[in-house]
Amino acid sequence: MKGKIPKIRNQANKVKRTPRYMEFPVTYEVYHVESGDTLWTIAKSFEIPVQQLMNLNKLSSDRIYPGQIIKIRER
């Protein structure tokens, strides 16, 4: 190995970068639909607009079914 210079990896230039943002899981308060429930009665009982329930649950109509789980709001 005469005349050869061994290569040394330079670790000093490697900087660990932290992410600029962190993702947190979103949790929701939910409601289990019972027989006789409507979006209107659910919205009224939680004091939120029907349209907010529809948007949050990606509903295209106001039809809901017993046993369905409806997101109410983020926790």
Curated annotation (Swiss-Prot):
One Pfam family this sequence matches: LysM
Classification lineage: Bacteria, Bacillati, Bacillota, Bacilli, Bacillales
Residue ranges occupied by any LysM domain in the UniProt entry: 29-72
Membrane spanning stretches: none
Disulphide bond pairs: none
The protein, known as: Uncharacterized protein YkzQ
Biological source species: Bacillus subtilis (strain 168)
Superkingdom of this protein's organism: Bacteria
InterPro entries: LysM_dom (IPR018392), LysM_dom_sf (IPR036779)
